[in-house]
């Protein structure tokens, strides 16, 4: 599972995800991508489950790029512990994902397999998503320029 090797501080504030994604909104590597439509924290386990679903559907052909990384520590206190007495230990790691962020990219497989793989990967994530293609991105850029 993904997690940082080293961090400056062990624990962080919860934080909020405001607005749309500042970067990572265009396809950089593959021909197909999975784009977030709403803000959410996505755990390392969810990222791994989605990656496995995508890879399995592609029958290990082509290439998968994971464009998000779980760098936010999520803490939790044990069950049946009273309030107070400090913040809990780091339980797991999550990635903050804003709307518009490309989370996964794939290439090297036919159109129908690519779309189905990303649909199955999206089912493992707690947010609504859209499948985007390089053709969609090109048309959007041309429309912006005009």
Curated annotation (Swiss-Prot):
CDD domains: Ribosomal_L16_L10e (cd01433). The gene is rplP. Binds 23S rRNA and is also seen to make contacts with the A and possibly P site tRNAs. One of its GO terms (cellular component) is cytosolic large ribosomal subunit. GO terms for molecular function: rRNA binding; structural constituent of ribosome; tRNA binding. This is Large ribosomal subunit protein uL16. Part of the 50S ribosomal subunit. Keywords: Ribonucleoprotein, Ribosomal protein, RNA-binding, rRNA-binding, tRNA-binding. GO terms for biological process: translation. It comes from Caulobacter sp. (strain K31). Belongs to the universal ribosomal protein uL16 family.
